[in-house]
C-alpha cells in the first residue's frame, strides 16, 4: 500500500510541475511571439513569390473586414478559424504544386500548428466561442475561386501573419 501512495504522490507532483511549466511558458509568450512571427515569415519566404505570381486576381481574399474582426471582440475566434482554414483547406491543396513547394508549405504548416498550440495553452490569448462573419466570407470566396483560391490564399499568407501580429499586439496591451 505505501508504494501505491508514493506513486500517486509522484503523479500528482508531476501534474503540478507540468501546470506550473505551462503557466510559466505563458508568461514568456509575449516575448517569444515576435520570434514565432519571424519564423512564419521566414518559412513563407521561399514560396511567397511562387504563390503570388500564380495569383492573377486583383481583389484581396483577406480583406480589411477580417482585420477588423481580428481587432474586435471576435478576434480570438477569427484567429482560431483562420489558422484552421489555412491548415485544413489551403495548405493541403498548396502542397500539390510539387515536392519543393510541398516541403516548404509543410514546414510553414508545422510552424502555424506550433503557434496554435502555444495560443491554446495560454488561454488569455485564445479564449473564444463565437463565429466570425469575415472568416466565413473568406472561406466562401476561397471556395468560389476553386483551384485559384489556393494561389490567392497562399499569396496573401503574409497579410495573414500581419493580422496575427495585430491581434496579438492588441491582446498583449490589454493584459
Curated annotation (Swiss-Prot):
Keyword Secreted in annotation: yes
Pfam families noted in UniProt: IL10
InterPro entries, sorted: 4_helix_cytokine-like_core (IPR009079), IL-10 (IPR000098), IL-10/19/20/24/26 (IPR020443), IL-10_CS (IPR020423)
UniProt GO molecular function: cytokine activity; protein dimerization activity
A GO cellular-component term linked to this record: extracellular space
Glycosylation sites: 130
Signal peptide: 1-18
Keywords carried by this UniProt record: Cytokine, Disulfide bond, Glycoprotein, Secreted, Signal
Cysteine-cysteine disulfides: 26-122, 76-128
GO annotation, biological process: branching involved in labyrinthine layer morphogenesis; cellular response to hepatocyte growth factor stimulus; cellular response to lipopolysaccharide; chronic inflammatory response to antigenic stimulus; defense response to bacterium; defense response to protozoan; immune response; interleukin-10-mediated signaling pathway
PROSITE patterns cross-referenced by the UniProt entry: INTERLEUKIN_10
Function description: Major immune regulatory cytokine that acts on many cells of the immune system where it has profound anti-inflammatory functions, limiting excessive tissue disruption caused by inflammation. Mechanistically, IL10 binds to its heterotetrameric receptor comprising IL10RA and IL10RB leading to JAK1 and STAT2-mediated phosphorylation of STAT3. In turn, STAT3 translocates to the nucleus where it drives expression of anti-inflammatory mediators.
Record text on subunit structure and interactions: Homodimer. Interacts with IL10RA and IL10RB.
Protein name per its UniProtKB record: Interleukin-10
Native source organism of the sequence: Sus scrofa (Pig)
Amino acid at each position: 500500500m505505501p508504494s501505491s501512495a508514493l506513486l500517486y504522490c509522484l503523479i500528482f507532483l508531476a501534474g503540478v510541475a507540468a501546470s506550473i511549466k505551462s503557466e510559466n511558458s505563458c508568461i514568456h509568450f509575449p516575448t517569444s511571439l515576435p520570434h514565432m512571427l519571424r519564423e512564419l515569415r521566414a518559412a513563407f519566404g521561399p514560396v511567397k513569390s511562387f504563390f503570388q505570381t500564380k495569383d492573377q486576381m486583383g481583389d484581396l481574399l483577406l480583406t480589411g473586414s477580417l482585420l477588423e474582426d481580428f481587432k474586435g471582440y471576435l478576434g480570438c475566434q477569427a484567429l482560431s478559424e483562420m489558422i484552421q482554414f489555412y491548415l485544413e483547406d489551403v495548405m493541403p491543396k498548396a502542397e500539390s504544386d510539387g515536392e519543393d513547394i510541398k516541403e516548404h508549405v509543410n514546414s510553414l504548416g508545422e510552424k502555424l500548428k506550433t503557434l496554435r498550440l502555444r495560443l491554446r495553452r495560454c488561454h488569455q490569448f485564445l479564449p473564444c466561442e463565437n463565429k466570425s462573419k469575415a472568416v466565413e466570407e473568406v472561406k466562401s470566396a476561397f471556395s468560389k475561386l476553386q483551384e485559384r483560391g489556393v494561389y490567392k490564399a497562399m499569396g496573401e499568407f503574409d497579410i495573414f501573419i500581419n493580422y496575427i501580429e495585430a491581434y496579438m499586439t492588441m491582446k498583449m496591451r490589454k493584459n
